[in-house]
Amino acid sequence: MARVKRGVVARARHKKILKQAKGYYGARSRVYRVAFQAVIKAGQYAYRDRRQKKRQFRQLWIARINAAARQNGISYSRFINGLKKASIEIDRKILADIAVFDKVAFAALADKAKGDLV
């Protein structure tokens, strides 16, 4: 039986990793061993940060809603509670958008929330 050398397969694997490491600084984009570690670590960061992105956006939305609610004389928690009691089901992403781009509509929502708290 003929001996199978793995030069073609190894070269393809190395090329694949070096292509993924394109744009990295120094040896990270040129030396296979270093590039492999950099690509693995980049994948770990990407996996982690796809989850963190969701948390961070929710935090941003809450901060924006809180700021707008306080301008209308109500705290965030009381505002959300008032909306729930008024059975207004608008998610935080849309509320934050309204708070930034449509102050009049947000003020109306805040008044509605205040009214249903009493």
Curated annotation (Swiss-Prot):
It holds the Pfam family Ribosomal_L20. One of its GO terms (biological process) is ribosomal large subunit assembly. GO terms for cellular component: ribonucleoprotein complex; ribosome. One of its GO terms (molecular function) is structural constituent of ribosome. SUPFAM superfamilies: Ribosomal protein L20. It comes from the Bacteria. Keywords: Ribonucleoprotein, Ribosomal protein, RNA-binding, rRNA-binding. InterPro entries: Ribosomal_bL20 (IPR005813), RIBOSOMAL_L20_CS (IPR049946), Ribosomal_protein_bL20_C (IPR035566). Belongs to the bacterial ribosomal protein bL20 family. Binds directly to 23S ribosomal RNA and is necessary for the in vitro assembly process of the 50S ribosomal subunit. It is not involved in the protein synthesizing functions of that subunit. This is Large ribosomal subunit protein bL20. It comes from Sodalis glossinidius (strain morsitans). The gene is rplT.
